[in-house]
Amino acid sequence: MTTINHTLGFPRIGLKRELKKAQENYWAGKISQQELLETGRELRARHWEQQKQAGVDLVPVGDFAWYDHVLTTSLLLGNVPPRHQNPDGTIDLDTLFRIARGRAPTGEPAAAAEMTKWFNTNYHYIVPEFQQGQEFKLSWTQLLEEVDEALSLGHQVKPVLLGPITYLWLGKVKGQVFDRLSLLQDILPVYQQVLAELAKRGIEWVQIDEPALVLELPAEWLTAYPIAYQALQGQVKLLLTTYFDSIGHNLETIKSLPVQGLHVDLVAGQDDIAQLHESLPKEWVLSLGVINGRNVWRADLTAKHQLIKPLVGSRTLWIGSSCSLLHSPIDLSDETALDAEVKSWFAFALQKCEELALLTAALNQPDGSKQAELDAYSAPIRARRESKRVNNQAVTERLAAINPQDSERNQPYLQRAEIQRQRYNLPLWPTTTIGSFPQTTEIRGLRLDFKKGRVDGTSYRTNICEHIKQAINEQERLGLDVLVHGEAERNDMVEYFGEHLDGFVFTQNGWVQSYGSRCVKPPVIIGDVSRPEAITVEWAKYAQSLTEKPVKGMLTGPVTILCWSFPREDVSRETIAKQIALALRDEVDDLQEAGIGIIQIDEPALREGLPLRREEWQSYLDWAVEAFKLNAAIAKDDTQIHTHMCYCEFNDIMPSIAALDADVITIETSRSDMELLDSFENFSYPNEIGPGVYDIHSPNVPSVEWIEALLRKAADRIPVERLWVNPDCGLKTRGWTETRQSLANMVQAAKRLRESVK
């Protein structure tokens, strides 16, 4: 039996972020839709060929998306929210963008669909909306067209399709409450039609993604799997594909399904492959996800080979990435500035394809002729363990010296709140922003010139100070109560801090997609983390010197830095988080000593870091909360600690949110129509809350009346004296014109509400 390999998906964005640039140029009216479509065709063709040349046997098709693959599935099924539908009922590319962004180059603006995290990753998907009685039909043939493209180019094609149960699981009911699982019988005919079309094209295998099978699903959802897959069997072979965790707890359901293969994630999951082999039907393909699709580290192919070798010859095996390579940068060979030793520790998406090819070749040659090549490839991993770049004795000793008091504020919240009220004397409904202001071409150019050495340090600081002054002046003109310095010096909220902490390295082109056209370049944590000098104090102190109003110091929290970086694999996530917390603890102390009395520690990734299995939640939450408190607890009683979170379902982690003991929490709520506040109301959350009153991911400017209505809904749930007024998130990606208009309306809404309670 010959072992073959495949990937579950490949990055869409292009090595130079070509897709992002084409999307944004199209949205700005700078290129035509035809030019955008051509960019997509070029990227797909390039990526298929690159995988083939790297040695991938089955090329995934259908992993490309114009915004998000879940949204693509919604269009495939004809699931378009009524507010986004074209008058004639047709679906086009602008329909897709209107759902995701709230507007498109054609069509009237309408509230964007909700966006949330894809399982426990930093990728976001557009949440499907379901209404009772809605109809589904094959309406968007992108998958079929792309399969035709790939076939015409001579590739061995494996279409990728998000499975029906996971699709329904990921969505939300809008309007009248009903069980969205009841829609299964309505969407299955569309899936049948798609599979029939693929069969007509001679497709043998379809990768049907059901990552919901790694979750602890309710019984009725598990029961739906046999129903769904009985309906889908027979037209093509189905590779039931799971990832992000193990599937042992759902194995009885899985092995009863009429599919022809199963893919398991052996990186994030802990499934015993010998047990899987014994449990699964002998005729099934067992696809082993042994190459990590979510990191940048070179694989220990010697160890992987030893793991898989005992199964060779006993059943048909495929070797694959643990999940889609969407979460990995594209090509390490493009990194010309990385230190050679550090570079030898890494593998990006294309290198992971090459790892699959080498591992497959070794498994197909049982005489051991590839063993030396495997060992040579894996040698840098062993060398890394002893590297001085990795180990810092001072950090180890400081971590060991932590005591319980280091994580506790001096006074409880109620006493602190009174002290802070006396210091700041803020009005009811105090207004603020989340941190960043628009990153103009001028600002980005300045940072690039400084990085390239075209601008010296003195000139750079002078220019950044001018941008800070502009941000302060804009906020004072608008009438905001608590100001920010605007973060002109920051490229990314995680990358910026990583650049100033020991233990991190950075890539030139290590971009990954976060959502739509939003790409991030995560730092890589390669060793013990420490802070050699103050990071933000200079800018915050200057901003505060320009105004009598309080200016917030802005930090990214330890859990978010961990979650939004590529972490080490040789120590626990808890250890890394606490190392970062100790480094940022020193920053909090330096800020307050410099006169900064309000300090925001952003933790948007706190919930994202949760394990997918609920039984593992509490252990994670305990150390995540401890890391935040270790970061913040050095603050004096009159120093007000804010935190910010977004895209969260808070209800099931409210005790941990409260345990953070932040004086103020600001959250993303506008897309959910303030529903997220229900969790805080039901829990009787004791501290102050700033519910986001407008969606910064959409260019739409909210009206005063819209914001006022949302704030009144908030006041129905939270006492007015504990409410703040702010946007959902930072304003980095917005333009100044819409930012001024939106913030002016926000301030005006707050003033109206103050008048109404006099």
Curated annotation (Swiss-Prot):
Cofactor descriptive note: Binds 1 zinc ion per subunit.
GO biological process: methionine biosynthetic process; methylation
Pfam families: Meth_synt_1 (PF08267), Meth_synt_2 (PF01717)
UniProt binding sites for L-homocysteine: I434, G435, S436, E487, D602
Catalytic activity: 5-methyltetrahydropteroyltri-L-glutamate + L-homocysteine = tetrahydropteroyltri-L-glutamate + L-methionine
GO MF terms, alphabetically ordered: 5-methyltetrahydropteroyltriglutamate-homocysteine S-methyltransferase activity; zinc ion binding
Gene3D superfamilies, alphabetized: 3.20.20.210
Residue sites binding 5-methyltetrahydropteroyltri-L-glutamate per the record: R17, E18, L19, K20, K117, R518, C519, W564, E608
Listed EC numbers: 2.1.1.14
Annotated positions binding Zn(2+): H644, C646, E668, C729
Keywords: Amino-acid biosynthesis, Metal-binding, Methionine biosynthesis, Methyltransferase, Repeat, Transferase, Zinc
Annotated binding of L-methionine, by residue: I434, G435, S436, E487, D602
Broad class of enzyme this protein falls into: transferase
Cofactor: Zn(2+)
UniProt pathway annotation: Amino-acid biosynthesis; L-methionine biosynthesis via de novo pathway; L-methionine from L-homocysteine (MetE route): step 1/1
Residues the record marks as active site: H697
Role description: Catalyzes the transfer of a methyl group from 5-methyltetrahydrofolate to homocysteine resulting in methionine formation.
Entry's family note: Belongs to the vitamin-B12 independent methionine synthase family.
PANTHER family on file: 5-METHYLTETRAHYDROPTEROYLTRIGLUTAMATE--HOMOCYSTEINE METHYLTRANSFERASE
Name of the molecule in the record: 5-methyltetrahydropteroyltriglutamate--homocysteine methyltransferase
